[in-house]
């Protein structure tokens, strides 16, 4: 079952410029899907379309086969959203905010209290539960915003830069919670970010969006193979020594290999050819390399 699907979805705010162009996307249930792109790429527009806050100019989208345009109430019931526009009430305490939004989502009072308590403890906000939100630091407010998105135990969680403005410790606890939701609870997490290293650590699949166009989607292996980013074998040799058929990058003689298990044979061959090897390692492609590979391909084609 696909948690999220979009078919030929386009969106224009003014009838002239397309903020999103012909989006075709399928996100399977479970796992963390990283929706990658710079500011202005169309990530927030996509989230607003999928959660029923905007209607597409063309095409249709669905969340667990529900139409956000036709069944917004049902979509909101199974979704949690943490974006900059999802505001809370400064005059209410952290606990009161969560209870209010829990009841708005249809939870009973007792269930709200229990769920709010669980989340405040998980996100290290329990001691601040009776403080007004206006007295929270930026990081605390950010974590409360995540708790708000989770209060109704959503099947799909939409997150927009969830660790922005958090200190490293808070970021780690948020990331652990996101991973746990995907692995143990089966929540589908749709994570919008432009932080590529962060996304590589957390996500199981990706979509690459640039200038309103989806350039590719899939797991890391699929994307890196498609764009031609492969594993490289790297050797560090004495100064002045060189390897034929290898490229020298950052002090390492490198060549592409198809599989990791080719490395021992290649190392033996280099040594048998009379080279002294100070160090040998496999250099795996990064999400950054894959991402910029797609962006450069788009620029060449356009």
Model-inferred region functions:
Residues 157-160:
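Catalytic Walker B motif of ABC-type/P-loop ATPase nucleotide-binding domains
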Residues 176-258:
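ABC transporter nucleotide-binding domain
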Residues 229-298, 302:
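Short, charged/small-residue-rich alpha-helical element at the C-terminal edge
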């Amino acid at each position: 079952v696909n948690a999220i699907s979009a078919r030929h979805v386009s969106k224009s705010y003014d009838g002239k410029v397309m903020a999103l162009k012909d989006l075709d996307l399928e996100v399977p249930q479970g796992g963390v899907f990283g929706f990658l792109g710079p500011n202005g790429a169309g990530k927030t527009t996509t989230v607003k379309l999928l959660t029923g806050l905007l209607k597409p100019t063309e095409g249709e989208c669905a969340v667990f086969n529900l139409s956000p345009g036709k069944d917004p109430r049902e979509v909101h019931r199974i979704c949690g959203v943490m974006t900059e526009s999802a505001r809370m009430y400064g005059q209410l305490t952290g606990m009161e905010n969560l209870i209010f939004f829990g009841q708005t989502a249809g939870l009973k009072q007792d269930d709200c209290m229990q769920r709010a308590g669980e989340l405040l403890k998980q996100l290290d906000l329990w001691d601040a539960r009776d403080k007004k939100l206006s007295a929270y630091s930026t990081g605390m407010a950010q974590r409360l915003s995540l708790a708000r998105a989770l209060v109704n135990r959503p099947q799909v969680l939409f997150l927009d830069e969830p660790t922005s403005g958090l200190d490293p410790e808070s970021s780690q606890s948020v990331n652990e919670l996101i991973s746990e939701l995907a692995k143990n609870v089966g929540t589908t997490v749709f994570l919008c970010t432009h932080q590529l290293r962060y996304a590589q650590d957390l996500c199981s699949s990706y979509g690459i969006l640039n200038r309103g166009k989806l350039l590719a989607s899939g797991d890391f292996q699929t994307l890196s193979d498609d764009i031609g980013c492969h594993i490289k074998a790297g050797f560090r040799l004495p100064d002045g020594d060189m390897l034929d058929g290898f490229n020298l990058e950052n002090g390492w003689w490198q060549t592409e290999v198809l599989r990791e298990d080719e490395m021992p044979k290649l190392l033996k061959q280099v040594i048998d050819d009379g080279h002294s090897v100070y160090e040998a390692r496999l250099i795996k492609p990064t999400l950054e390399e894959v991402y910029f590979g797609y962006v450069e391909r788009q620029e060449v084609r356009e």
